[in-house]
Regions:
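Bacterial N-terminal signal peptides
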Residues: 15-25
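Glycoside hydrolase catalytic-domain context in secreted enzymes
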Residues: 30-665, 671-673, 678-688, 696
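Bacterial N-terminal signal peptides that target proteins for export
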Residues: 2-17
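Intrinsic low-complexity/disordered segments
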Residues: 2-3, 28, 32
Length: 699
């Protein structure tokens, strides 16, 4: 299957995503014909001011916090007297999950966001956002709490599965596309959790000590891009304290950075229970307390009556939200509940999941499986019987339906093939079934959830099951369904490993599509998989999880793959890594300066030397020259491109790196500065494998 072919040059160059540059081709427009008729921000703001001037004090105070009822967990009621519509909020990183006091309507359970990140495909992220927003409207809401763009600082984080991974550049590109997809439907995106919501342990009170440069270069870029590029309409402030101040009452984070520096004109909501004050939160720039009013209720009225909070501040809070709702067409219209197109969205979920799976190991080209040559299969393990539809907590979605793994595998096999399915609880029975089968497939996984961090070991018994089955059958395939990285003590004993993440409601079909070659895997890891717990920040309790009061981000810029390279520690699987059933080569790198003070055009060939079509993610990294700021990471992702190539095809890939790609945050200048010196440009298929390199000197 990997026989080399004569390469067929293709003249047209593929221009892809790179530093602060949008994908050139195939982008969905963020403006529909209907949206073009909506008021501009200036017009909406003027109308909102007129509206607020007509409100009574009681009406104003009732509009700055949420309430909940028997069917909806958080919403702001409308004011019929003034034709002010309801704001109905839906959780959303993994699909429309309205939540509620005892009720939640089903929706499409999409693959987990970490799976979406593994696709390394902004266009897929855009479509994902569009479809999730479409269901938000179908379920009667107008704000979708999505995406979650916190950096996966530690693999133990309980919400890594909700995130887009460990690299700020990758997260930024996916965030912008996802938000544009959401807001193209008229649904308000609510990007979260600002900022540095990186662990669940002590999340409500922990003080994170983060230096300014690290905050700006690692934890803020995706939020900055969401505001400046995607023009996100709303933002959620997070639980932790950053350098002594709670996020939701930090004048620096909310007022100075978001509103003044980034020119954010939307509204800011709190995470649930993340408000700790009345006066400080209002004056910092918080607009809406959710889910209900504790500090923005009677306490706020007292603060206004005493003169500690001017009524003008309350007026501005309302103007900001009403203006955005007007811009998005919600004044004069309410979302109408309508049926979700189950089959259409299910097909999309299946495709998304398959494109996100990462082939970690494939010795002897065991995969893809040829159903014509398989007489028997043993499908084993706790995740063989039910679909891994998602993680737990607020992002949980009740699926419209689910496809069990055994159903997906059974449908992919010939009718005469014997399929034995066991959950693995009886290891002896599983071993016996594996010994008698031609192929053994072991499906294992974890259950990440909001509110608690976790270890990076598989749950008890799963490693032992894999080891026992592998000993009984040399053709054992392990399928992981995890929300983050896990240790693999059995890795050397199995020929094939597929990371499927939480595939969503189409689990069984999507996994079978990859195992049997209907889909050629093209996913790449958005997080690093460590060899041992000691290789993570957990080796230093001050860095993670902290002492219960403080956690120190003393690793600075060396987060994720940067830390492994800087310390000379080999990961189990590197950031950006992922195999294919095809084989690719990189060649002919050219780096052309673009402007005297930073910027470059990076071009190279990607060739498919296999006999089948496949997709490769070309990745561009920079190594900065030594600068006054010091402690430069050994490499930083600055561009990537997912390119699909037919057998024997090669294409020129061009990526435009702008000045920002060559810049660092200067605390002294309080801004971005271009680093003078020689930058090392590296191109390859992972952070660990960059066969092409060249230099770019900046004066």
């Amino acid at each position: 299957m990997k026989t080399e072919l004569e390469l067929k040059p293709v003249r047209a160059a593929l221009v892809c995503v790179s530093a602060m540059i949008m994908l050139v081709c195939g982008a969905l427009s963020a403006q529909t014909a209907r949206q073009s008729k909506r008021p501009t921000h200036q017009q909406a703001t003027a109308r909102a001011r007129q509206l607020v001037a007509r409100m009574t004090l009681d009406e104003k105070f009732a509009q700055v916090h949420g309430i909940k009822d028997a069917t909806h967990f958080r919403f702001v009621p409308g004011l019929p007297r003034l034709a002010i519509p309801e704001l109905r909020v839906t959780n959303g990183p993994a699909g429309a999950g309205p939540g509620g006091a005892g009720s939640q309507k089903p929706a499409t359970a999409w693959p987990a966001p970490i799976a979406l990140a593994a696709s390394w495909d902004p266009e897929l992220a855009r479509t994902y956002g569009h479809l999730a927003a479409d269901e938000t409207r179908s379920l009667g809401s107008n704000l979708l709490e999505s995406p979650d763009i916190n950096i996966a600082r530690v693999p133990q984080g309980g919400r890594v599965f909700e995130s887009y991974g460990e690299d700020p550049y990758l997260v930024s590109r996916l965030a912008v596309a996802n938000i544009e997809g959401i807001q193209s439907t008229g649904i308000i995106a609510n990007v979260k959790h600002y900022v540095a919501n990186n662990q669940e342990t002590d999340r409500g009170s922990i003080n994170e000590v983060i230096d300014e440069r690290t905050l700006r270069e690692i934890y803020m870029p995706a939020f900055e891009a969401s505001v400046k590029e995607a023009h996100v309409a709303s933002l959620m402030c997070a639980y932790p304290r950053v350098n002594g101040f709670y996020d939701c009452e930090s004048k620096l984070l909310l007022g100075d950075v978001i509103r003044k520096e980034w020119d954010f004109d939307g509204f800011i909501t709190s995470d649930f229970g993340a408000v700790h004050s009345t006066i400080a939160s209002v004056l910092a720039g918080l607009d809406l307390e959710l889910p209900t009013g504790i500090y923005f209720n009677g306490a706020l009225r007292k603060a206004v009556d005493s003169g500690e909070v001017p009524i003008a501040a309350i007026d501005e809070i309302l103007v900001r939200r009403y203006a955005k709702m007007m811009e998005f067409g919600w004044f004069g219209a309410q979302p109408r509940q309508r049926p979700i197109p189950v089959l259409e969205h299910g097909a999309a979920a299946r495709s998304f999941a398959a494109q996100s799976m990462v082939l970690l190991k494939n010795e002897g080209s065991l995969l893809p499986l040829d159903r014509d040559r398989i007489q028997s299969v043993a499908l084993l393990g706790p995740y063989a019987l039910h679909a891994a539809t998602g993680g737990g907590g607020s992002s949980h979605v009740i699926p419209l339906y689910s496809v069990a793994p055994y159903d997906g595998v059974d449908a992919a096999l010939l009718s005469q093939t014997k399929l034995t399915v066991l959950d693995g609880s009886d290891v002896a029975a599983a071993v016996d079934a594996a010994r008698k089968a031609k192929i053994a497939i072991v499906m294992v996984g974890d259950d990440e959830r909001e509110g608690t961090d976790h270890g990076i070991e598989l749950p008890p018994g799963q490693n032992a099951l894999i080891a026992a089955v592998a000993k009984a059958n040399p053709k054992t395939i392990v399928v992981l369904k995890t929300g983050s990285a896990v240790l693999m003590p059995w890795l050397q004993d199995v020929p094939a490993v597929l990371e499927a993440w939480y595939p969503g409601e189409e689990d069984g079909n999507a996994v079978a599509d990859v195992l049997f070659g209907k889909v050629n895997p093209s996913g790449k890891l958005p997080i690093t998989f460590p060899r041992a717990l000691e290789d993570t920040l957990a080796a230093n309790p001050d860095q993670y999880p902290g002492d219960g009061k403080t956690v120190r981000y003393s690793e600075g810029l060396n987060v994720g793959y940067r830390a492994y390279v800087s310390r000379g520690v080999a990961p189990l699987f590197a950031f950006g890594y992922g195999l294919s059933y095809a084989t690719f080569q990189f060649s002919d790198l050219k780096v052309t300066p673009k402007g005297g003070r930073g910027g470059a055009t990076v071009s190279f060939y990607v060739s498919n030397i296999a006999k089948l079509t496949g997709a490769e993610v070309a990745q561009v990294y920079l190594r900065f020259p030594p600068i006054a700021a010091g402690n430069e990471p050994p490499l930083q992702l600055k561009g990537f491109c997912k390119v699909t190539l037919k057998a024997g095809e090669r294409r020129v890939v061009k990526l435009e790196l702008d000045k920002r790609a060559f810049s660092y945050w200067s605390g002294e200048a309080h801004g971005w500065q271009t680093a003078p010196g020689t930058f090392h440009v590296m191109v390859g298929d992972s952070s660990e494998n960059t066969p092409l390199s060249a230099d770019r000197t900046v004066q």
